[in-house]
Structure formats: structure tokens, C-alpha cells
Amino acid sequence: MVHLRTRSRAKIPSNLTQLALGYQQVLDANPYQTEALVGMSLVALASRQSEAAVAMAKAAVAASPQIGITWITLGQVLKAEGRIGEAESAYERALFINGMDGLAQLGLGELRLSMGLPEAALVHYRRALRRQPTMASAHLGIGHSLASMNRHAEALAHYRQAHELAPHMAECDFCMGFVLARLGHMDDAIAHYRSAIARRSDFAAAWMNLGVLLREQGRLHHAEAALARAVTLRPKDVDGWLNLALLLREQRRQPEAEHVLRKAFALEPENAHVLMACCQLCMARNDLPGAWEWLRWSQARAPLNAEVVNLHGILLHHERRLAEAAEMFLRAEELGSVSAASNRGNSLLDMGRLEESLHAHELAVLRNPQSAGTRYNLALTQLRLGDWANGWENYESRWRFREVHPSPLHFRCPRWRGEPLEGRRILLYAEQGLGDAIQFCRYAAMVAARGGHVILQVHPPVERLMHSLGVVRSGMACVTQLGEEPPAFDLECPLMSLPAIFGTTVETVPWPGPYLAAAADPVAHSLPQASAHAALRVGIAWAGNPKYKADKFRSMRLHTLTPLFRISGVQWFSLQKGVAAAQLSGLPEDVYLHDGAGKDRDLADTAALIAALDLVITTDTSIAHLAGAMGKPVWIMLPHLSDWRWMQDRPTTPWYPTATLFRQSTPGNWSHVMERIAARLTTPASAQCLLPKQKF
């Protein structure tokens, strides 16, 4: 939540007590001294003593009803008390005294804007500007009115004029930061927030908005410091605590987030945003009963709040009540939620209604073009449907989407965009999982062909494997591990941005033949000899990284595969690593599965094992990518709604010519997949074609 907040235009010195004493001395000598009464009223207003402020302003009016500033002051303090009608009358009286009074027009503009009437406010602000062309506050007011109507570019022009007229006014920088963020110029917005803070170090709203933008950029340490400063300066501001809680929750610091939310709840227990944040915190720790309870509290207090309705849809989606979720998201859209269309697109996607999902995501981007998450969801749908030209471009939004990159890497050198390298050194680095590194390292040779030297930085488990890449063996690239300091480089590019740079389409996926290979290694020779009755040696993997949020859909329990292990003529080898490998001990006594990966040090060892097999059968894991990259026949078992890279309703994939895809016919139904694989394994023709080594 980033906020545009303004403070009173009155310039009140910081030492209010001393100022009040000075005015009081004047009033002791002359209780009807107008200037002192006006000054005391403004001091009381700045000190949040509203009753005293009104009393002093009325005394000033009584002393000098013919002087416009007394009525303007009365209007200002009445507006601060929420007495809108009386404030309007006071400003109108000031104009009756002097129709050319710019301050009275300014006051009416502020009044109209506070009433939610920005167009009416513009009329008064412009009149004020005509009376006093150098009035910075009038430009600020015009900017506020335009910003409230989402006319941010026009608002920025007026904020800049205000800044030229009053370069030391912190509010000008603050307001420029606000609209620049809305226009997508995040770095410029951050710079202006910092300037506002430099001019006024206690500017709590600037600290808060700075923290929000830094969080969106993944600069979490600096964001936390800014938000902590904001809540220190303004401890009763619920929005500051909410933003800090959101940051902590995204860092999975749940106990701290809960502690901060308690502070927000203590301040405003009826605040729907606080209640929704409590609901989201329960969802993050998978406490669905608690989440539903907080949602009900939110609904009781704000039943027509668009984000409350949107959150209801999120909970329904989380429980896989997809049709209900899509309907709830549609209601949230009608109420004005900017994120609900993207959420509806996700529900439609999970129901297999791809074209409707695409339309919803396109609509979401139109409504909220600056949202990284919205554009990222559109990208995944486009890639899934084969629209790679647009999909790769939109996929770049992942760097601004914290769910994908909570702490993105920052380099001092430029990002490579595909230009000739001319002998420069370029860092290509893995950014997501092991399988992604294996899938996209094929592009390293294409980058080197642009005339530079490639430094390939990958996860430790695949570092040794990458030495088998032809571009590394030729000396045109070297390999280093993530977390290590790489050799000096001139340019950088993440591996998963390379398909966009090279304009990859479904028809032009680079496949130079198998591009990863096993080194000569004792592992390959340690496999048991093929049994007399076994014609096929098959490797199996059934589970991925359990930390991946969609792992419950792509992974299975080992016992699900038991029917395959009873097929005669097949010798089975486990390629499974991680916690799921412990399931080997629970196999029935009549089933035997060699633990081929138990002693693997890394994926180079796994590659040596795969090289000795005839076939690999796996769920969507790094093993699928490794076998495919080696040119080994691989059967990939996929959930009903698989990852975008396997596209939709295809038995094959352009990424790996030797891969066959076995997709669930209905969500969660692995039994049909087992039946199809068993049929293929027991068909003599199918089994026989696996035995010869593949040639490319």
C-alpha cells in the first residue's frame, strides 16, 4: 500500500511551544489582536488541539470579521475537524470579502478534494493559480486532483512546477515519487522519496512509500529499514505496520509478521485490511480454518470491499473449489479489484479453460499494466498455448515478481540484449531450479557464437555436469558455481532470458543433438548386471523438490508405481534423491528396486547412471531434463495441468526429441498414467525400440 498524503499548507515552526508563548504574550496585552489569534489557532491545529484551534479562529473572526484571512483560518480548522459545511461557508465568506483571494480558492479546492470531488477541486485550484501564479500549493493541489483521477502524467507536470517554485518543499519530491511509481518509473520514484526524506527526515509517509518500492524491487534489507523507520515515526499508522508485516511474511518470517500484525490489530481491530492480512498469514502457514475465520471477520466489517471478495476467491482456489473461485473473482472485478482478473485467469487455467484464462489475463494486464505478477501470469499462459513471441517478452516480468525472485541479483554491468559481443566476457547464470539450468544451458554455445567468452554460473549439483557442454570443452566457456565469485565479466544475462533474445518459437527450439553427457565414471560400472529375464534397464524418479509450491501436483508416492515394478522383463533402478528416496524402504517384499542414486555426489554421477540405462521414467523433475539433454529415451509423467514448458495436450515436446509425455487425464489421477505406461512397456514393439542406442 503506497499512499499519497498531504499535510496542511500552513508552515508551522517545529518549536510550537515557544511560538505559542510568543502569541500568548501578545494576547495578554491585547486579547483581540487578530494576527496573534490566527497564529494561536494554527499552532493549536498543528498540535492537534482541534477545539482550541476552532475557538481561536472564531475569536479572530469576531475580532476582525472584515479580514479574509480570519475566515480562511476558520475554514482550515473546521475542515480539519470534518465540519465540511461550516468550512465551506467560511471560505465563501472570505471570497465575499475579497473575490480575488487565492488562499480562499485554495481552501475550497482542498475542501472539494477531501469530499472526493477532484474535478470541482481543479476549478478552485486553477482560480487560485490565476490569482497567484507563483503559488506552489496550488500546483500541488492540481497535481493531487489529477492523480486522484489517475491522470498521473499531467499530475507530474504540476508537481514539477511546484518543485521549481518551492525547491526545498519536501512534499513536492514526495508527490513526484508517488506519481512516478504509478507511471512505472520506480528508480526515479525512489530517488524522489529519498530527496523528500533528505529535506525532512521525519517524513513518515515518504519512509513508508520508499520501503514499499524497495520491497517491490527485492531490496528487502533496505525496505525493512525504511518501513521500520516509518512505524517508529508514526506508530499509530496502521498502514505502516501492515506493509512491514507483508514484508516479513514474504520473507517467511511468520512469527515476526504475526507480532507486527498484532500491533496493527490493536490499533484498528475493525480495519478490514488488518483482518485480511491476518487471513493471508494463516494461509501462508496452511492454517485454513484460521484463514476462514479471519475472512468471516473481514466480510462482517466490509462485505462489499473488493479485496475482501478477492481474498474469498483466493481461499476457494486454495481449496480447489475452482468454479466457485472463478465466480467470486468475477464479483471482485465488478467491485473494482485490480488483481481479481488475474486470479480468475488462474482458476480458469486450472480448470483447463485455456482460452478463457488467456482472455482474463489479458484483461488483467490492461487494467493493471504495471503489475509484475499479472504480466507474469499472462506470460505463463501464452507460453503454454505456444504464443512464445509474446510469452517470452512478458516472461521478463518475473524479475519484478517477488514470488519468483524475492531477492533478485543486481549487477553493476549492463544486461546483454543480443548485440555482438566483440570479445567481451558475459556471465550467464542459472536463476531458478536445476532442471531450468539443464534446459537452457543449450543456449550457451549460441551466445559464444556472438563473439565473446561465456562464464556459465550454475548450482553446485550441476557444475561438474556442465563441463560436458561442447562450448565448455572447446574453451569458449568456463563454469563456476552460484555463490562463488565468478571471473571478471563485462555483461550479464540470466539463462532463462535467452529464448527471448534468440526469438525462440515452438518450431525453432535449438537442438544440436544431445548436449550433455556422462564422463567416464566408476558409477556406470557399478550397476548390477542385467538379470537373465530382464530385457530393459529402466531408471525411475517419482518426486521433485518438496519446497516447490506446486510439488504436490507433480510428485507422487512411490507405492503409486508398484504396478509397474511387477512387469516382467524390466530391471528397475531408482534415480530418486532427497527425502522421497526414503520411501524405498517401504516397498513390498516381492518388489525390488535398485537404489542407483543412493551414492550419487551430484547430477554428473546421475548422468553416468542414466547413460547405462535403456529408458528413464520420471515425474517433472531435473531428472527429466537431464535424460532429455543426454538424448536418452525418457517418459515424463505429468499432472493434468503441467508446467508451462510442456505446453498442453501434446504427447511430445520440442525441447527434447527423445521425450514422451504421459499426462493425467483428470486432476490427481495417476492410475490412468500407470496403465498407459504399463501398456507401452508390455508391448513388444514398444519395448524393443528402446534397446538400440539413439543416433543423432
Annotate the PLM regions.
Residues 1-615, 620-696:
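Alpha-helical solenoid repeat scaffolds of the TPR/TPR-like class and their adjacent stem/linker regions
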